[in-house]
């Protein structure tokens, strides 16, 4: 297993100080009810042009300093009861690290867990929002000359959509220091904290981190088309999305895996995160997601056409419900859905699968000036049965980061139906 050595650690200050009128950033109810974790993303660049080889860190630091002036809550401090951020311009934590192996050793490994070395130790998915900077960046240098750029952002301030906007704006600034981002930290105007609510009771309990294993699988565009054809020919489903058909397949493989272990079928619950932008404006920064809950109570409902039909129905029902809902009601409804899911998890009546998506965000093309990454990934998730969908590096396919227990992964990765439509992702960086 590769190890890392910290070369330097510093705080990146804002290029322009935050105006006193923006010093107190009110958190929204959506922010408040999220798990206070650091979400970890990493971008791998194996070949650095010679004109950048000696100034990568300088480019990242200078551009980060400027972009933080627009994303100022990331350089502040979250208060103890998660109601506001003191935008005191403390800065973002920035580490320079040396990795004692070539990048190919990481990217060609069958399991994704080895990428954890490019993240600050013990930070990914941890509840460190009060003790660490809301943004922690690590630049990792490999023996081969390649680099990885990782960013861990506090989920209290950002959801995945906002993280993608920030990374894209940071990269645009790195390429052109005249670029001006336009984020709006106004989520609390749409989702205000209700004054009558006992805030401490809405805070989610943090769960101890557990070690699982992750593998990334690729669904090529042609295989996604095959899956869509299967679904549409055997049902009344129209225009299934690539995430819907891929979700249905990994869900079915999960059910097969579970039945191999227990010898019987167990009902399932799958959750998908849905972005609320729109109707919320696209440049609204903060947490603005709701969850879609889909169940399969029988083996027949697990079949691809049937499960995709249920996914689409549940998605449309949620859209219809939210369409007529006042914005200040949305957080309470989201909290209600979350509590329903937690009750099912605690009762252990269903196998639960958690899905989130970072598709159509441009993260697979993040270019700080030295080209696009060959791999975008996350640190190993603490929750088992977790599926994260991302755009593949080229084309219209999907990459899916799958986290399971070690024993379950051994069964899952040998599933013939999975391997008919998806393949493990490994890269050659030579």
Curated annotation (Swiss-Prot):
Summary of the function given for this chain in its UniProt record: Catalyzes the transfer of short (four to five carbons) branched acyl chains to the furanose ring of di-acylsucrose acceptors to produce tri-acylsucroses such as S3:15 (5,5,5), S4:17 (2,5,5,5) and S4:24 (2,5,5,12) acylsucroses.
GO biological process: sucrose metabolic process
Acyltransferase as UniProt keyword: yes
Family note: Belongs to the plant acyltransferase family.
Active-site residues per Swiss-Prot or TrEMBL entry: 155, 367
MF-aspect GO terms: acyltransferase activity
Summary of subunit composition and partner proteins: Monomer.
EC number of the protein: 2.3.1.-
Effect of inactivating the gene: Reduced total acylsugar levels, with abnormal accumulation of di-acylsucrose, S2:17 (5,12), and two triacylsucroses, S3:19 (2,5,12) and S3:22 (5,5,12) lacking furanose ring acylation, but impaired accumulation of S3:15 (5,5,5), S4:17 (2,5,5,5) and S4:24 (2,5,5,12) acylsucroses.
Tissue-level expression: Expressed in tip cells of type I trichomes of stems and petioles, sites of acylsugars production.
Top-level taxon of origin: Eukaryota
Top-level class of the enzyme under EC nomenclature: transferase
Pfam families: Transferase
Name of the molecule in the record: Acylsugar acyltransferase 3
Swiss-Prot/TrEMBL keywords: Acyltransferase, Transferase
């Amino acid at each position: 297993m590769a190890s890392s050595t910290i070369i330097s650690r510093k705080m990146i200050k804002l290029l322009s100080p935050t105006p006193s009128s923006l010093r107190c950033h009110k958190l929204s109810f959506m922010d408040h009810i999220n798990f206070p974790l650091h979400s970890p993303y990493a971008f791998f660049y194996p070949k650095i042009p010679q004109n950048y080889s000696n100034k990568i860190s300088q480019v990242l630091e200078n551009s980060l300093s400027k972009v933080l002036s627009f994303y100022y809550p990331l350089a502040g401090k979250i208060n103890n009861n998660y109601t506001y951020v003191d935008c005191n311009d403390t800065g973002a934590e920035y580490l320079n690290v040396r990795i004692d192996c070539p990048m190919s050793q990481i990217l060609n490994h069958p399991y994704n867990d080895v990428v954890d070395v490019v993240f600050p130790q013990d930070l990914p998915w941890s509840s460190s929002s009060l003790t660490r900077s809301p943004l922690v960046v690590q630049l990792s240098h490999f023996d081969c000359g390649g680099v990885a750029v990782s960013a861990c952002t506090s989920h209290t301030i950002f959801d995945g959509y906002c993280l993608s906007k920030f990374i894209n704006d940071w990269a645009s600034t790195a390429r052109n220091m005249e670029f001006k981002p336009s984020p709006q930290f106004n989520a609390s105007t749409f989702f205000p904290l209700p004054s009558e609510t006992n805030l401490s009771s809405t805070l989610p309990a943090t769960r101890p981190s557990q070690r699982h294993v992750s593998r990334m699988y690729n669904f090529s565009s042609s295989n996604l088309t095959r899956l869509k054809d299967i679904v549409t020919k055997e049902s009344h489903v129209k225009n299934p999305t690539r995430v819907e058909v891929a979700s249905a397949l990994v869900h079915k493989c999960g059910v097969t895996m579970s039945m191999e272990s227990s010898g019987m079928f167990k009902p399932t619950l799958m959750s998908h995160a849905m972005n609320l932008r729109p109707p919320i404006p696209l440049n609204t920064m903060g947490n603005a997601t709701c969850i879609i809950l889909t169940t399969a109570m029988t083996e027949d409902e697990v079949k691809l056409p049937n499960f995709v039909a249920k996914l689409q129905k549940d998605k449309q029902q949620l859209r219809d419900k939210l369409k007529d809902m006042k914005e200040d009601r949305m957080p309470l409804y989201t909290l209600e859905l979350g509590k329903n899911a937690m009750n099912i998890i605690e009762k252990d009546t269903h196998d639960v699968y958690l899905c989130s998506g970072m598709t159509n965000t441009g993260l697979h093309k993040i270019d700080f000036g030295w080209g696009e990454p060959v791999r975008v990934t996350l640190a190993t998730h603490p929750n088992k049965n977790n599926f994260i969908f991302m755009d593949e590096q080229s084309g219209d396919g999907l990459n899916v980061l799958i986290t399971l227990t070690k024993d379950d992964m051994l069964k899952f990765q040998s599933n013939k139906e999975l391997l008919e439509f998806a393949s493990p992702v490994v890269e050659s960086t030579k």
